[in-house]
A protein has these predicted regions:
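S-adenosyl-L-methionine
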Residues: 2-50, 55-56, 60
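Class I S-adenosyl-L-methionine-dependent methyltransferase module
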Residues: 63-167
Length: 167
């Protein structure tokens, strides 16, 4: 196993980039440590069998990577980014608009969006739910319907928060 030096890790990962989705067990704090022990070079194909938020693979930034996960909505979300369906500007506009509705209508609006997502599986709605649900959970019932409750923060999507998400 090839181990990177501390200086190589610091040069490669000056700042850990936070992904747009919250997930349980996110490895943000472990990225520098993982980078130290994971040899990623031009010949490396990074394989991430349990993608989760993708924070490790995205920060290591290999030339070639295979990301997988059992959560199809997670995969569809990142595919939508990859194919240009989801953009930073589009997500900003969507989250600001939906955030204003959440602020005025509260939990009822959250559950309306949750029902809409369960019918359409729109990646914009997936992002909204992930950031406004209880504790950033991703949970689906046996019918494969998103069933996480509302996080009870009607003013969730402040401009600063939206900027953090889309950057």
């Amino acid at each position: 196993m090839v181990q990177a030096t501390d200086q190589e890790v610091n040069n490669a990962i000056e700042k850990v980039h936070i992904p747009p989705l919250k997930t349980q067990g996110i490895k943000t704090k472990l990225v520098p440590w993982i980078a130290r022990y994971a040899a990623v070079d031009v010949d490396t194909v990074w394989v991430e069998p349990f993608m989760g938020s993708g924070v490790v693979g995205f920060n290591l930034a290999p030339k070639r990577a295979i990301f997988s996960d059992t959560n199809i909505h997670l995969i569809d979300f990142y595919r939508a980014i990859q194919n240009g369906e989801l953009t930073a500007a589009g997500c900003r506009k969507f989250l600001e608009s939906e955030g204003a509705r959440l602020k005025s209508r509260g939990g009822d609006y959250f559950y309306e969006v949750r029902n809409r997502f369960n019918d359409s599986h729109d990646p914009h709605d997936f992002l909204f739910l992930n950031r406004s649900c209880f504790n950033g959970l991703m949970r689906f019932n046996r019918q494969h319907r998103y069933n996480v409750p509302y996080g009870h923060n009607d003013n969730r999507f402040s401009k600063a928060y939206v900027t953090n998400i889309v950057n």
